[in-house]
From Swiss-Prot:
UniProt entry keywords in alphabetical sequence: Ribonucleoprotein, Ribosomal protein
Lineage, uppermost ranks: Bacteria, Bacillati, Actinomycetota, Actinomycetes, Mycobacteriales
InterPro entries to which the protein is assigned, alphabetical: Ribosomal_bL33 (IPR001705), Ribosomal_bL33_CS (IPR018264), Ribosomal_bL33_sf (IPR038584), Ribosomal_zn-bd (IPR011332)
Name of the protein in question: Large ribosomal subunit protein bL33B
GO biological process, one term: translation
Amino acid sequence: MARTDIRPIVKLRSTAGTGYTYTTRKNRRNDPDRLILRKYDPILRRHVDFREER
């Protein structure tokens, strides 16, 4: 099995609408749904939710 099959690279986009993104890997077996992480948005200078985009 290829490396990207189990842990694909996904983009996390800010829900605040600034357009800022993070890239990360996720495990499809543990997280089959869209990933939502609370991370720092440097444009707003505060922590906001970042949601996986497809």
